[in-house]
């Protein structure tokens, strides 16, 4: 799962942004029919196991609306396969692996059904299940072209042994604010407990803000995305606080601007090079048996209560595609697959969280026996993903270039980031 977020954002660069739609937006309620449908799911072994059981249960009760399911065809990426199918007009009805970053391109191709206008209960079902998190997946027209499905909320992992070696409380570490983290970093460095404190991917790749700035900014800003209302947001007071925090980490040698020689995502923490790490619940698989770790919410400038701390969701969603003949069955299957029982089964089978506001209640017994996952559960309703915007690749790369020059480098932070915001605003205006 370590490259999950990066793969989702990478999708944006590989997809053809068609100048004209190759299909309608699927908003005609009068055209809704029922019957057999086809779906795709990811090649992840655990997700396949979950999907097969859900499909089997559905088919047993709906012989006239049979669901045929298969893994996304092999290729360069699942996004490439979906885009090619949209162009050819032969997509399945549903894809249970739709990356939020790819939705603008799929929508521009005319491949996605407008769920808000096509189904009478579209808005009610999605917002009723996912709450305010659904708003982060809305397209610029305000409608939903994807069903929020599952999330991997990012939190801050800490190495208990390294904190103890630095004379810090390893069981209840003080890491709520930026100043707390910087104070801990000073102690860790002075004690020689770790080479670095935080060591996120350091290269200039446009996906890397998802592993340093963006999760921290979401936490500090109350869930504000990089772009909102047609403008870049990161030069706000909250954005500058986060940028200055990271600049201090690099300036003091608490973080490294050199690319890590191993796994850039999980490696520094798993290998004992960094005392802190940023990851979702997938991090446990990389850290178990290697690090004696704990997990806390991401810090903010002033300190934010855990139940109010937003974070990056690293989500994958479900798209309903316009070439589907039996859209009503597809929609009914979506709702069935995301009922409480099937959402619980998703968590139990894959370790990934359904994006539902009551996940802690639905999975109470399971989470009671899995304390690490229970820690992440409270963050699920507070997850936010990348903004649904055109030119997303260029926008994120513009931000990353400015980051490298001013946060990791020596350029003036205010003028460099202000210039990047102006460039991003121009890219947004291009549409």
Question: Can you name each region flagged by the protein language model?
Answer:
Residues 42, 212-215, 243-326:
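Extracytoplasmic/periplasmic substrate-binding proteins
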Residues 57, 61-129, 165-167, 268, ...:
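Extracytoplasmic "Venus flytrap"/periplasmic binding protein-like
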Residues 140-149, 154, 179-231, 274:
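Extracytoplasmic/periplasmic solute-binding protein
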Residues 92-93, 124-163, 307-310, 382-389:
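A structural signal for short loop-to-beta-strand junctions that line the ligand-binding cleft
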Residues 1-38, 60, 422-431:
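Short, low-complexity disordered leader/linker segments with a strong preference
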Residues 183-187, 228-258:
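Glycine-centered hinge/linker elements that transmit conformational signals in sensory
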Residues 100-153, 209, 296-297, 364-367:
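Hinge/lid segment of periplasmic solute-binding proteins
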Residues 348-398, 405:
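Long, aromatic- and glycine/proline-rich binding clefts that accommodate carbohydrate-like moieties
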């Amino acid at each position: 799962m370590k490259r999950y977020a990066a793969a989702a954002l990478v999708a944006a660069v590989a997809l053809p942004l068609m100048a004209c739609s190759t299909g309608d937006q699927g908003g005609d309620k009068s055209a809704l029919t029922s019957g057999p449908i086809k779906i795709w799911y990811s090649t992840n072994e655990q997700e396949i196991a979950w999907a097969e059981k859900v499909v089997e249960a559905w088919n047993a009760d709906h012989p006239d609306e049979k669901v045929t399911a298969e893994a996304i065809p092999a290729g360069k990426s699942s996004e490439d396969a979906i885009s090619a199918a949209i162009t050819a007009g032969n997509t399945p009805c549903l894809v249970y692996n739709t990356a939020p970053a790819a939705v603008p391109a799929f929508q521009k191709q005319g491949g996605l059904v407008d769920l808000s206008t096509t189904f009478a209960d579209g808005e009610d079902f999605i917002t009723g299940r996912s709450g305010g998190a659904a708003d982060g997946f809305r397209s610029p027209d305000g409608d939903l072209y994807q069903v929020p499905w599952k999330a991997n909320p990012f939190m801050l992992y800490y190495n208990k042994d390294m904190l103890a070696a630095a004379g810090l409380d390893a069981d209840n570490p003080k890491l709520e604010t930026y100043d707390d983290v910087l104070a801990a970093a000073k102690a860790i460095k002075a004690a020689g407990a770790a080479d670095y404190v935080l060591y996120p991917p350091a290269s200039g790749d446009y996906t890397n803000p998802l592993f340093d700035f963006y999760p921290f900014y979401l936490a500090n800003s109350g869930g504000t995305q990089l772009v909102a209302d047609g403008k870049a947001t990161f030069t706000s007071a909250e954005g500058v606080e986060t940028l200055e925090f990271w600049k201090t980490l690099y300036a003091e040698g608490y973080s490294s601007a050199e690319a890590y020689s191993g796994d850039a995502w999980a490696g520094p923490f798993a290998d004992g090079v960094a005392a802190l790490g940023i990851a979702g619940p997938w991090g446990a698989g990389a850290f178990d048996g290697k690090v004696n770790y704990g997990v806390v919410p991401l810090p903010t400038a002033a300190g934010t209560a855990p139940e109010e701390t937003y974070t990056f969701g690293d989500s994958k969603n479900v798209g309903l595609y316009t070439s589907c003949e039996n859209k009503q069955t597809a929609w009914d299957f979506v709702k069935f697959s995301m009922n409480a029982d099937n959402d619980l089964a998703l968590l139990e089978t894959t370790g990934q969280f359904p994006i539902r506001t009551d996940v802690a209640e639905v999975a109470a017994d399971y989470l009671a026996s899995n304390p690490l996952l229970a820690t992440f559960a409270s963050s699920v309703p507070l997850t936010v993903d990348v903004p649904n915007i055109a030119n997303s690749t260029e926008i994120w790369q513009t931000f990353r270039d400015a980051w490298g020059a001013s946060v990791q480098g020596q350029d003036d932070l205010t003028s460099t980031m202000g210039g990047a915001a102006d460039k991003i605003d121009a890219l947004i205006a291009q549409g």
